[in-house]
């Protein structure tokens, strides 16, 4: 497995060579590609059946199967991410937090937050940024990890070295029906989770609802590679290596096969931009990481 220092160095080199791609709602003209992306976004919203990897299943069946899958992998979830990304997911999450720039007093909800990777980084970085910038707040920084799977939340609570002085709370809840009042949070995130939900449009609407005016939504997710040669190499690694590694290291071939398939079925970067715009987010943008192996999407509630 890649060590933290070498991983971060590799990640930063990759990020430095890949320009961010941004699309801001209402700016400039709309191209044919944008029209096509909007059409695919609308189609994705209105289809009755949904994808479980490459299978078409009913929405009820998908939610049940995803819940069972993550219950089975909860104790090895971080290993699952390490295998699928060669450990680089940790660097991508660090970069996401750099993009968020947490400050003291801000309130975060991490939707489908699993074992709390983003919440822990958010709380820690808010303190660091406050000291560095001389920013203080009478309100305490808070991060809520909301996940539908109690096994994932339990794995997060049991993580070694977890210490946030009560700033992190753990809430069982469905991303499609968040158990929170409207306009509660400054930042909403979902990291490597949205491709597993049944109705992405409902999740996006819920994220929009619970954000305060001026709040920001960030989505970090595996995406679509924009380099043909790299795409072929990535497909080979994904379909021929990841399931085998899942079997060897976690004793679970099927979960890792689903992981690969779910990535391929996730909307491409521009389609997801249109889905965010359809929800109501403004100044929507995305940044490719490693030529689109992953991407960070950002939208504002204005």
Language-model features and meaning:
Residues 11-68:
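N-terminal auxiliary segments of SAM/dcSAM-dependent transferases
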Residues 72, 76, 86-107, 121:
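Conserved alpha-helix/loop element of class I SAM-dependent methyltransferases that forms part
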Residues 107-178:
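Class I SAM-dependent methyltransferase SAM/SAH-binding core
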Residues 176-188:
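A short acidic, Gly/Pro-enriched loop at the edge of an enzyme's catalytic core
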Residues 186-200, 223:
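A short SAM/SAH-binding and catalytic strip from SAM-dependent methyltransferases
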Residues 201-213:
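A short glycine-rich, Lys/Arg-flanked "PGG" loop and its adjoining helix->strand segment in the class I
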Residues 220, 224-279, 285:
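C-terminal alpha-helical "lid/dimerization" subdomain adjacent to the S-adenosyl-L-methionine
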Residues 279-302:
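Core SAM-dependent methyltransferase catalytic element
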């Amino acid at each position: 497995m890649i060590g933290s220092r070498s991983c971060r160095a590799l990640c930063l080199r990759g990020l430095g060579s890949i320009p961010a791609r941004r699309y801001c709602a209402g700016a400039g003209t709309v191209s044919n590609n944008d029209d096509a992306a909007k059409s695919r976004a609308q189609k994705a919203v209105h289809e009755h059946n949904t994808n479980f990897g490459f299978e078409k299943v009913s929405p009820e069946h998908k939610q049940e199967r995803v819940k069972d899958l993550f219950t089975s992998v909860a104790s090895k979830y971080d290993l699952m991410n390490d295998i699928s990304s060669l450990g680089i997911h940790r660097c991508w999450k660090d970069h996401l937090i750099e993009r968020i720039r947490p400050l003291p007093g801000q309130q975060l909800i991490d939707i489908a937050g699993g074992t709390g990777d983003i919440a822990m980084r958010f709380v820690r970085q808010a303190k660091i940024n406050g000291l560095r910038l001389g920013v203080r707040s009478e309100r305490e920084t808070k991060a809520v990890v909301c996940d539908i799977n109690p096994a994932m939340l339990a794995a997060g609570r049991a993580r070694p070295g977890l210490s946030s002085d009560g700033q992190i709370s753990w809430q069982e809840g469905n991303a499609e029906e968040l158990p929170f009042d409207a306009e509660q949070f400054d930042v909403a995130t979902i990291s490597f989770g949205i491709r597993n939900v049944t109705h992405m449009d409902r999740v996006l609407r819920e994220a929009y609802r619970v954000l305060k005016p001026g709040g920001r939504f960030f989505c970090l997710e595996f995406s679509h590679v924009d380099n043909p040669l790299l795409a072929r190499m990535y497909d080979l690694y994904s379909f021929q290596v990841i399931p085998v590694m899942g079997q060897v290291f976690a004793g679970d071939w099927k979960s890792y096969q689903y992981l690969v398939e779910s990535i391929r079925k996730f909307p491409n970067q521009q389609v997801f931009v249109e889905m965010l715009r359809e929800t109501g987010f403004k100044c929507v943008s995305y940044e490719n990481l490693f030529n689109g192996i992953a991407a960070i999407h950002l939208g504002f509630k204005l």
